[in-house]
Structure formats: C-alpha cells, structure tokens
Amino acid sequence: DLVLHSVTKYLAGHSDVILGALVTPPTDAGRALRERLEQHRLLHGAIAGPMETWLALRGLRTLHLRVERATATAGQLASRLGSHPAVGRVRYPGFGAIVAIEVAGGAEAAERVAAACRLWTHSTSLGGVESQVERRRRHPAEPATVPEGLLRLSVGIEDVEDLWRDLDRALRA
C-alpha cells in the first residue's frame, strides 16, 4: 500500500505551505516501491525546499494540540448548532474538526450566513489554525447530491465562545 498525506492541511496546520508526503509500508514490496520513488525524485528533482520542510516540521510539533483543541470546539459547536432554528441539519460524526450544516432557506440563506461571518474565513481549504466556512455547492462541478444550503465549517483553534457568537450572529442575520 501507498499512503499519500496532504501535509498542507492538518500536518503543517498554518495555511502557509504546499506539500505532500508519500508513505510506504515496512515490507519488502514497500521498500522496493520506495526505492523506485526515490529514483524518480532524484531524476526529476521533485523535492521540497528547506523553508517548506521547516514549516511542516513546525506544524508537526503542535499537531496534537491543534487537533485536540479543534476537535473539542467542533463537538461543542455541532451540539449547539443542532438546536439552532436557522439550521436544518448538522452533519458531524462525533470526532474531528469538520462540521457540515444545512442552513434552512437553501443557497441564498447559506451565502448570507457565510458572508456575514467575521471570524470565519470564507475559504475552500481546511485544517489550519483559523476557522473557515465554505458553501460547497457554489461551483457548477459540485454534484447535485450536495445540498444547496450546505456549509462546511473547518474549525480552528480560536475560542469556542467567540466562534459560537459569530456563527449565531451570522445565522440570525
């Protein structure tokens, strides 16, 4: 097996590096694959620069703290959003820092909520220290199975009460 990690997201965690990592298993086949990948990298120059690797290492040092904080905050927000009158549905598996909500009122209401957020960055990315909101169905390429009013919330490490006040205010706007 070969595992591809997006170091850009949670591993680096500060939205300031674009990097990936390939991980091979500690087996004979895995070692053979790794040797082939290293040869390809050597011939084609696909290596990360020193600044990118330093930024990734910096992020790895705080990964456990960031994930712990963001996960706890996401759980609290998901619980509160479940009883909010402007939210039709909350999608949260009970772990992790991604919460999806369906805003009552569909696409226009979801756009208004996203635009009204002040602490939440309106962005497609995820896994950073800053909280981000995105309406997933904005782009024509999104499948019709994605609800029109769906907002994806990538929860960062800000104070839960600050994030809640901002979301609540935006949902009531």
Label every model-predicted segment.
Residues 66, 131-173:
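PLP-dependent enzyme catalytic core of the Aspartate aminotransferase-like
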